[in-house]
């Protein structure tokens, strides 16, 4: 909802400007994403040079004509009754909860639909199961046939990846970094990042376990 949705909307606006997407409606169906987008629009001083140049030439990428923001639950339910082409951007990204789960439930058996998973999905989540492209999947206790096309787009994560984290830390004074704590992500990925940091000259890297205490 925060970061990734806005990047997707910005990308769609650019694709529309290039004539690669027609005038089909785009719905952002997530109250948090709607509110977060308003925050983005209120703070242009945080935009980079590319974004300022785009605003000058093309206008607001978060407000093009066919873009609609959905906050109310009843409006969200109405989207499931549509039979014309549309793009629905919804959360959560891993499809484990939220409105997106209902959209998948209502459209996964439709061979004319495409479900695109954007970004990382943790093991065991509905999103991770969909990425494996099963022939059937259980949602809300009901076994459904997967007739929709399943696609993935891994380049749009709101989180810094392995190399971006190392690059960020490489700009810090290593002598002043007394300890680095890795507290987010799967253990195997944390261990891989820890090894990458060690290879780049960082020391005292900890992967805390639940209730473990450290003296700082």
Across the structure, where does each feature detected by a protein language model lie?
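Acidic/His-rich, metal-assisted hydrolase cores and their charged scaffolds
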Residues: 2-216
